[in-house]
Each structure stands twice: as structure tokens, then as C-alpha cells.
Curated annotation (Swiss-Prot):
InterPro entries in alphabetical order: PFN (IPR048278), PFN_euk (IPR005455), PFN_sf (IPR036140), Profilin_CS (IPR027310)
SUPFAM superfamilies the UniProt entry points to: Profilin (actin-binding protein)
Signal peptide: none
UniProt-recorded name of the protein: Profilin-1
PROSITE patterns assigned to the protein according to its UniProt record, in alphabetical order: PROFILIN (PS00414)
Pfam families with a match to the protein in the record: Profilin
Length: 131
């Protein structure tokens, strides 16, 4: 199965009639393994900040999480495992695996819980597969 299939069929799939607005799977170094066509163009330092927050939980809390120039307020996650951010009616969930970052971005009417479910479920699966 190609990495694109994971984005198309597992991240951007329909959940209770809703979809993520965009999603990606990146390496810890910021390399793009696959992404949805409308995933924001990000800067390397934005990914570096995200990775640092996984290594040092709370690093992004004072400044916020930036991705593609968009600032998200960091909200409760799982230190070292999941980062969650909120912006207006939408937000972002990022799950860290041994080799990858799974990112899902949503907006209403999708709920934060639906985004968390989709992103974290795929992340757990990839961890089980050795990624």
C-alpha cells in the first residue's frame, strides 16, 4: 500500500459525514511522505518546533503551534505522543510514531474528537507496523 493511500483512505475518509480539511504524514525531519493536495505549505522551523514539543512537552504552549503560517493555540494532548491545537472553529491533531508525524487539520462541522480519532487510530496502527 502506498503512503498516499493512508492519507486518502484513512485520514481523509468520511467520519459521520465529515472529513478532515487536510492531512499529511511527515518524517521527523520534516520530509513529506505524503499529503493531501490542500495541505498547507510549511516551513522547516515549524516542523522542528513540533518535534521539539514532543521531546520537551510544553515547549509550544507559550508561543503556539505554527503550521503553514497559521497559529494554533496548544491545548491538552498526551505529552510526547499527541499534540492538539485549536484555531477558531477548527484545529489540528498531530500523532508521533517512531518514524513519522501524522497530521490532521479540521474545521467545523467536524469535531475535535473526530479528528483525534482518525489521526490517533492511524498513528497507533503505524506504530504497530514498526513505523
Amino acid at each position: 500500500m502506498s503512503w498516499q493511500t493512508y492519507v486518502d483512505d484513512h485520514l481523509c475518509c468520511e467520519i459521520d459525514g465529515q472529513h478532515l480539511t487536510s492531512a499529511a504524514i511527515l518524517g521527523h525531519d520534516g520530509s513529506v511522505w505524503t499529503e493531501s493536495p490542500n495541505f498547507p505549505k510549511f516551513k522547516p522551523e515549524e516542523i522542528a518546533g513540533i518535534v521539539k514539543d514532543f521531546e520537551e512537552p510544553g515547549h509550544l504552549a507559550p508561543t503556539g503551534l505554527f503550521l503553514g503560517g497559521t497559529k494554533y493555540m496548544v491545548i491538552q494532548g498526551e505529552p510526547g505522543v499527541v499534540i492538539r491545537g485549536k484555531k477558531g472553529t477548527g484545529g489540528i491533531t498531530i500523532k508521533k510514531t517512531g518514524m513519522a508525524l501524522i497530521l490532521g487539520i479540521y474545521d467545523e462541522p467536524m469535531t475535535p474528537g473526530q479528528c483525534n480519532l482518525v489521526v490517533e487510530r492511524l498513528g497507533d496502527y503505524l506504530i504497530d507496523q514498526g513505523y
